[in-house]
Amino acid sequence: GVTPRDKHAYIHQLYAEIGYKCIEVSLGSKERYLSLVDPFLSSGDMIYSNNARPIPEMNISIPRFTTVPLTKGWLQFKGNFDSDYLSDQYAGKYTFVEHVLWHQKSVYFQISDTRGDFPLSGTVGVQHIVQWGGTSTNPKIGEQPHSFKDFVRIVLGAKGGGDASLSDQINVLGSHHISFDFGLKYQAKDWSLRGYYQHLCYDKSGMEFKNGTDGLWGLELNLSAFPWLKQFVFEYVTTRNQSRPFHDIWFDHDKHPGRGGGGDDYYNNGEYVTGNSYFNRSVGSPLLVSPEYNTDGAPGFQNNRVRDFHFGLKGDFSPHVSYRLLLTAMNTWGTGTAPLLKKRDGISLLADIQYQHPKLKGWQFGGSVGADTGDVFGNSSTGFSLKVSKRGLLKAYK
């Protein structure tokens, strides 16, 4: 049967945050928009999207591009650093690895003329997430290293010590995912065009670009002079290479120098069997199908070799009515170790309408209709949602 969904109610976001100049510090569960992709029109960041519920974190960040001194306004940067633990459950009741620790960081640099005289700008950055520590319910794995020295190892992406598994001693301690992000933008008077690429890495073979073009390729067009079509996004996501099928690290490196690697198996890990997920949903791109859709009830990602095409657009019908449309054409071939005999494909659609009454300040009313066709997520399905929201201060104190 199909894995049951989590039917419990929960608070999606709850956090405290303070800021001083360009620095912000937050504690709690908060949706974060860190990377180059648009948070509302993109198919989702490959490393850290908002597909899963927000992870409780202690986070320090410079969330907006800030000018680097002595660069005459040409160089800006932003980034963040956080750490916490994943109180994760699978299918709402099972815990395979208890008290898993979590680390995430990012840094981006942008070359841009802040005076607006030069139309081109470029961005380069890196994102890094790690699952580490914890105690596996599998007695063959058991408790994982979790000392402060091990924390330094996972932050730096270093090999594990003598108390780590053989795989982590050969490769790196913990379950790591990294993306190298690149962007180039042309800004005209009434429009802008931006291209971007997220190169997905699972280990050193990916960091050396041995996994080909795996990742997310995107184009974003902004049209400020056309309110009925303000923004258009096209994305191509491919994860079929994965540094080729074989993970050849089990050889004598002294007798046979050279790099092992291959069989990257994105979002999966031998020690952390629920993979790069939180409460059954992918922390990264939703196009690598989340464990909650596994029909056999097994943990992990069973469809991480994909080739997908995504379109998103938004605009305003009037000063008070806006819309958003998303369409994704999906193809999946299973995994490198468990390929599908026949590929699965499907199309996902979303239409979203928002209305703001001119006399009700801060209030917004909306509705969405979505549909999945094909067999990527199991059977075809449709759904809808209604939303009422209020933005602003509950009470202002003077």
Predicted features by range, described:
Residues G1-P4, Y20-C22, S29-S35, R64, ...:
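Transmembrane beta-strands of outer-membrane beta-barrel pores
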Residues G1-V2, S43-Y48, A91-T95, S167-I170, ...:
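Extracellular loop and loop/strand-boundary signature of outer-membrane beta-barrel proteins
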Residues V2-Y10, G174-S175, C201-F209, Q302-V306, ...:
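Solvent-exposed loop/turn segments connecting transmembrane beta-strands
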Residues G19-I23, F65-G79, Q110-T123, Y186-S192, ...:
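Short loop/turn motifs that connect adjacent beta-strands in outer-membrane beta-barrel proteins
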Residues Y33-K140:
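Internal, well-ordered domain-core segments that constitute the primary functional module
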Residues E57, S380-K398:
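Outer-membrane beta-barrel "beta-signal"
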Residues P119-V124, W132-K255:
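Long, internal scaffold/assembly segments composed of regular secondary structure
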Residues P245-T335:
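C-terminal structural cap/anchor segments
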